[in-house]
Each structure stands twice: as C-alpha cells, then as structure tokens.
Amino acid sequence: VTDDADLVARLRREGLEPSSWSNGPHDVYGAHDHGYDKVLVCVQGSIRFGLPAIGSSVELAVGDRLELPAGTTHDAVVGSAGVTCLEAHLVAGSLGDGPRRIASGEW
C-alpha cells in the first residue's frame, strides 16, 4: 500500500510540486483543456477521465498516474467513494504527445 507522503515524495523527486484536491462521490467535470502539461496521481478513491479526442477513457485508482499534455481535452467523473488526487503542472510540451496512464507500481 502506498501512502500520500510517499506519492508526494516520488513526484518531488521528479522536480514536481504537487498540490492536492478532493471531490465527493459522482462529481462531474465537463470537457475542458489546459495550456500547461498536467500530472495527476490518485491518492484516495477513484476517478474516470474521458478523453474524447481519442474516443476512450481511463480509470485512476490509488497510486495510478495520468499525464495530460497541454491542449488535451478531458472530462471526469468521480467514483462512488469520492477522490483525492495530487496534481502538478509543467510547461507545455514537457510530456510529449498524447495522454498516458501509468499504473500504480509502474512509475
């Protein structure tokens, strides 16, 4: 089991400064994008990110990571237990092409 402090430390070792946010069960974010690259790590609960440009979605559970390059349109639906995520921003172009999910234990 990975705790929040370990996940924060792992991101900081990459030169990232994560912040934390939470949402209640079944909260919804409409489709949007950002002008910066974003790294997300789920630390509690779960969340599903829709990626309409590629016609798919990704589910994040505890320890899973999602990398979203700038301009990637995404929406989200929080799981039934709510969610807490760490989020860090990078200069646009830092992450390369296309979104990437990395499972817990693989990053």
Each model region followed by its residue ranges:
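Histidine-centered metal-chelating micro-motifs
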Residues: 28-29, 65-66, 70-75
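Short acidic-glycine-tyrosine-enriched beta hairpin
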Residues: 54-70
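Short, conserved beta-strand element in jelly-roll/cupin
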Residues: 33-49
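Conserved short histidine dyad/triad with adjacent acidic residue
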Residues: 17-34
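Short, charged/polar surface micro-motifs in flexible loops or helix N-caps
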Residues: 15-16, 25-26, 44-48, 55, ...
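Double-stranded beta-helix
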Residues: 2-21, 75, 79-107
